[in-house]
Amino acid sequence: MINELGEISTSGGVLLKMWEVIVQSGSRPLVRHSHIRFEITLITAGSGIYTVGDKKYAIKPYEIFVFASNEQHCVTEVGKDGLKMINLHFEPRYLWGRSFDRLSNVNTNFCFQHSPNFENCIPADRARQIRGLFTSAAEEFSKKEQRNEVQLCLLNMIIVALIRDFGYFDGALSAPTDKNRIIRKATEYIDMHFQENLTLETLAGLSGLTPNYFSSLFSKVSGIKLWDYINSRRIEAAMQLLKNESNLNIIEIASKCGFNNTANFNKAFKKTVGITPGEYRLSDNIII
């Protein structure tokens, strides 16, 4: 069961979203679940197993889990008492292009990769500060008159705690470079136009760079390959349509998400999610 707590949207789409998830006990299939959005999860009750890449974490109440963009994670086991959690997702562009705080100067790849020594699970006894901020954000979303600046301020404090107290990020809070700005502009363009027939030449041309140099720069600055980023955006959109738009067939969904044929769509979807679009549409499990 999913209970939407609230979201903050801009003209470019949903910026931040928070919801509560309740999952019944039992084993769950391993799905290569990942997304561009940065994720922070609070376990409020129950137990289970989180599979993150090659690691497995025993889930316990009041723990915090943190997942970078495109980091594969999946709950593969839920204990006999079920599992209850609150998820917070925010887009990388939340950190980009703002002038009112130093978080806008975090390296572009903050959301895409963390320190190699960072553990995805923050134990309950070390998570008190983040848990308190997280709970306050959920309470703000539950109010009838939401004040977006409050939720965003709380998120800022959570990010600062991850950097300062838990060694999430090795990078420095330095001023953005021209290269950072180029890649930020490119990702914003992709986010708005991923449904279209994007080409390397088009994206490179927006920045006045050669295709080879632009492709290399995108990977270096963002920490993710250009076409992996584009396909992730397209697959995320396809997953939403597969679950929420039963009137659309798979060919129509592929077209709406920027794939020029179903063969490419099926291949990209299975590579990302681990199952075919048809299997995903028929599955009853909430992928978390």
What are these regions (language model features)?
Residues M1-Q24, Q72-F141, R164-F169:
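A hydrophobic/aromatic-rich effector-binding and dimerization subdomain
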Residues D125, F141-M157, T177:
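All-alpha amphipathic helical-bundle segments outside canonical DNA-binding/catalytic cores
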Residues S34-Y50, V66:
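Short, conserved beta-strand element in jelly-roll/cupin
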Residues T44, R131-S142, T187, D191-F194, ...:
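Regular secondary-structure segments
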Residues D54-A68:
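Short acidic-glycine-tyrosine-enriched beta hairpin
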Residues I130, F134-A138, L155-I163, K179, ...:
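Hydrophobic alpha-helical core bundles mediating ligand binding, dimerization, or RNAP-core interactions
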Residues A161-G167, K185, Y189-H193, N197-R233, ...:
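Basic/polar phosphate-binding segments, predominantly the helix-turn-helix DNA-binding elements
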